[in-house]
Amino acid sequence: MSTVVTMSTETNKASVRRFYEEVFNKRNRAAIDEFIDPNQVDHDAPPGTLGGLKGAKQTLTMYLTAFPDLHFTVEDIIAEGDRVVARLAVRGTQQGAFMGIPPTGKQATSTAIDINRFAGGKSVEHWLNMDTLGLLQQLGVIPAPGQ
């Protein structure tokens, strides 16, 4: 039984790595269907986005429109059972509007913790904690402490 869990866990980890590489880094938007369940529950979806796969596609479009050179690096990945946790490094240049912020032309880097719960080979539940404050400071929207 532990072999089955290990294989499933390893498959889920590989799926998260492939998701960031294919969908975001290679801009293969159609590949999102392979990774996200149509009814995925996203606990940290951006305001105004739909749920499920449609919402994930909206979020993808929002990020790639605002940051056309967006790149994710999976720095660490841990899995147990049906959950995968990835520690991410994110970088990009804001060339489009982002959550009501006009383009700044500034390059920014951020970190994020991404958690997915898998069933049937797809993410059915998602959480994302990103350093949004640091991102907004780098874009010049919020002053950094001491400025």
Regions found by a protein language model. Name each.
Residues 1-147:
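C-terminal and inter-domain tail/linker signature
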